[in-house]
From Swiss-Prot:
Cofactor stoichiometry and binding remark: Binds 1 Mg(2+) ion per subunit.
Subcellular location: Cytoplasm
Family according to the record: Belongs to the adenylosuccinate synthetase family.
Positions with a binding annotation for Mg(2+): D13, G40
Chain residues that bind substrate: A299, T300, T301, G302, R303, R304, R305
BP-aspect Gene Ontology terms: 'de novo' AMP biosynthetic process; IMP metabolic process
Binding site for GTP: 12-18, 40-42, 305, 331-333, 413-415
GO cellular component: cytoplasm
Protein's gene: purA
The protein's name: Adenylosuccinate synthetase
Function according to Swiss-Prot or TrEMBL: Plays an important role in the de novo pathway of purine nucleotide biosynthesis. Catalyzes the first committed step in the biosynthesis of AMP from IMP.
Catalytic class of the enzyme: ligase
Amino acid sequence: MANIVVVGTQWGDEGKGKIVDMLAEKADMVTRFQGGNNAGHTVVVDGTQTITHLIPSGILQNKTCLIGNGVVVDPKVLLEEVDKLLGMGVEINADNLLISERAQIIMPYHQAMDHAREAKKGAQKIGTTGRGIGPCYEDKAARKGVRFVDLLDPAVFDSMVREACEEKNFLLTEFFKADPVDPDAIIAEYTEYAKRLAPHVVDVSVVLNQGVKDGKQVLFEGAQGTHLDIDHGTYPFVTSSNTVAGNVCAGSGVGPGQVNEVLGIVKAYTTRVGMGPFPTELEDEVGNRIQEKGAEFGATTGRRRRCGWLDMVLLEATARLNGLTGVAITKLDVLGGLDSLNICTAYECEGETLNFFPADLKVLAKCKPVYETMPGWTEDISGVRNFDDLPENARNYLNRVEELLGAPIKIISVGPGRDETMVVKDPFAG
């Protein structure tokens, strides 16, 4: 038995939703610990695609799903998601969907600030999703954010919203030259959300720790990817939370000793949405082919993902930052049909070889990938369910990735469906 944290190893969009959905079958509790509705986790069951943005993917397996204190929650989006899932026949109640009373709430003024800032930056924008995630985390750090425990106290909530709107409206109108927000409308709208969500609000830390004491298996579901981490990512082209495995404790209220396994989700190639350096990016027919075959469009934004070869310099940093105990390789099938495959094993920058991912984006922008080339395969592998049945060149590719990464491959995904997966070793077995 083990408690597992699942993290993205690249720039997000690695296929975490599918893997979490599969692992949830053996889990008792599934927990989100950071991020907001800027994440989109896609699950395909019996040909039906379901995308969740806030509710943990485990809800489709009727598991106890928890939204930790490290998550920033847009209650409107959350309730829209609840209603959509209920309409699909998914059971959601106050027993299987629990929200931390300490979780921060995204307010309309956060979204207004997000849009106003991006508009003012113009060409220098960082590519935010505009959902108010960053401004909400800012208010949290400034100790003036609204938590669920505050939302459920009408007098406290009223006072906090009016004070916040006074400050935000000054910035919106005077500095950004944007429209103000209406505190009365916000209070009325969010009071209705409070009525529906109140039964779901609990102390998630207490629930989780009691579950662990009772021998329940917990799956912690990360959002985005390691290199979007606010501290360790390609700053400032990052998200506003810590996406690495170490944040699972702070973001959900459990101790480090209660996390046994760290499973990194590795897409068989690399993708990135939005701005920022991308050393292995392919801006040719191969890149277009991968983009089209892999259907590389953001589940949350619909934006086209930039595509490139697998980057082991990037992944070395990921393994080091997260302490990976295993990996799941996704979208291996997308590489089928290519004559040869490249794996980036180092960077070359102004005559020097770099083996570690640089923090300075000016340096990263100058980095050229040093490639190791391997033969590809032509066979359709979407029906393969055992590692030994994969084409020899596919096995060689995976073995080389495992060797370079220094962490065992435990799961291989060869298609979007729940059944298009092979388990090399059960992560819950440790």
